[in-house]
Swiss-Prot record:
GO process annotations (BP): cell differentiation; sex differentiation
Species for this entry: Macaca fascicularis
Gene Ontology MF terms in the entry: calmodulin binding; DNA-binding transcription activator activity, RNA polymerase II-specific; RNA polymerase II cis-regulatory region sequence-specific DNA binding
The gene coding this protein: SRY
Subcellular compartments: Nucleus speckle; Cytoplasm; Nucleus
Gene3D superfamilies to which the protein is assigned, alphabetical: High mobility group box domain (1.10.30.10)
DNA-binding region: 1-55
Key words of the record: Activator, Calmodulin-binding, Cytoplasm, Differentiation, DNA-binding, Nucleus, Sexual differentiation, Transcription, Transcription regulation
GO CC terms, sorted: cytoplasm; nuclear speck; nucleus
The organism's place on the tree of life at top rank: Eukaryota
Name the record gives this protein: Sex-determining region Y protein
Subunit structure as annotated in this protein's UniProt entry: Interacts with CALM, EP300, HDAC3, KPNB1, ZNF208 isoform KRAB-O, PARP1, SLC9A3R2 and WT1. The interaction with EP300 modulates its DNA-binding activity. The interaction with KPNB1 is sensitive to dissociation by Ran in the GTP-bound form. Interaction with PARP1 impaired its DNA-binding activity.
Homology family: Belongs to the SRY family.
InterPro entries in the record: HMG_box_dom, HMG_box_dom_sf, SRY-related_HMG-box_TF-like
Length: 55
């Protein structure tokens, strides 16, 4: 969610006429193409946000 939130904003600005469903498909594809090492910082950020939310 952390990654897609930022990427969705960028994609929406770059492609204002693109439908939300198409943006979601593109984001899903891009996420799958990332390596585990590329994904790791976003997993860490999500864990940090979860911990803050629990407090």
């Amino acid at each position: 969610i952390v990654w897609s939130r930022d990427q969705r904003r960028k994609m929406d600005l770059e492609n204002p006429k693109m439908r939300n469903s198409e943006i979601s498909k593109q984001l899903g594809y891009q996420w799958k193409m990332l390596t585990e090492a590329d994904k790791w910082p976003f997993f860490q950020e999500a864990q940090k946000l979860q911990a803050m939310h629990r407090e």
